[in-house]
């Protein structure tokens, strides 16, 4: 988020996230294909590939989530993952959003799609951010909804052993405009600052009385 103070005049600023996610690409692009029919077939083939990948991700995600009969089924969070190793991709929700954006773009004409590309329009985020998976060992402690500091447990017991808790955190980048103010803000009229903001997610924690349980804790989720 961009914190601004005491403006001398109204200014409208739009920011756009700068997260990057793994995706699939065809060889070449639509402009190198042999005409409208080939372009349509290329889009259809790529859409089928995306659908196949998303279906596989959904199947894997269902294996991680508790069953409906489990009383902890509602504890699942898109930014928290239980895994035996570091996740190799962003949360499924982010991938699905990227997939939806792809489908929206596929329905545009080539000319409209080129002009709608943020890179072609010279758009930049108001604040630069970075995202990564972190472990409970790196977080160690967090603040819960009551304002108390709790210990974030590194491992969660499951029927076949233990899994580690991973948190997908997004924070302001240490480089760029984080310290100099928000990009696009006129320094003559505004004082601005890029600041990391937090949200609550469910995690397995332990309080100062050694009571273990699932609690909402704060983690960094945006800039």
Curated annotation (Swiss-Prot):
Main location group: secreted
InterPro entries: Brain-der_neurotrophic_factor, Cystine-knot_cytokine, Nerve_growth_factor-like, Nerve_growth_factor-rel, Nerve_growth_factor_CS
Annotated S-S bridges: 127-194, 172-223
GO molecular function terms listed in the Swiss-Prot or TrEMBL record: growth factor activity; nerve growth factor receptor binding
This protein's UniProt keywords: Cleavage on pair of basic residues, Disulfide bond, Glycoprotein, Growth factor, Secreted, Signal
Chain segments annotated as transmembrane: none
Glycosylation sites: 107
Annotated compartments: Secreted
Family annotation (PROSITE patterns): NGF_1, NGF_2
Record family assignment: Belongs to the NGF-beta family.
Protein's recorded name: Neurotrophic factor BDNF precursor form
């Amino acid at each position: 988020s961009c914190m601004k103070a005491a403006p001398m005049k109204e200014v409208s600023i739009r920011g756009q996230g700068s997260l990057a996610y793994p995706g699939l690409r065809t060889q070449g692009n639509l402009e190198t294909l042999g005409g409208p029919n080939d372009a349509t077939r290329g889009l259809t083939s790529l859409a089928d590939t995306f659908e196949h990948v998303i279906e596989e991700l959904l199947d894997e995600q269902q294996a991680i989530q508790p069953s409906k009969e489990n009383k902890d089924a509602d504890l699942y969070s898109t930014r928290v993952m239980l895994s035996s190793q570091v996740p190799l991709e962003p949360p499924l929700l982010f991938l699905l959003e990227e997939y939806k954006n792809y489908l929206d773009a596929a329905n545009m004409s080539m000319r409209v799609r080129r002009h709608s590309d943020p890179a072609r329009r010279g758009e930049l985020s108001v604040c630069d951010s970075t995202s990564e998976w972190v472990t409970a060992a790196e977080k160690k402690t967090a603040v819960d909804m009551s304002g108390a500091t709790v210990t974030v447990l590194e491992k969660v017991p499951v029927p076949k052993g233990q899994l580690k808790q991973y948190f997908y955190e997004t924070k302001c980048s240490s480089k760029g405009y984080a310290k100099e103010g928000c990009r696009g803000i006129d320094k003559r009229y505004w004082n601005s600052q890029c600041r990391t903001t937090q949200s609550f997610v469910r995690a397995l924690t332990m309080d100062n009385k050694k009571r273990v349980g699932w609690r909402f804790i704060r983690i960094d989720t945006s800039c």
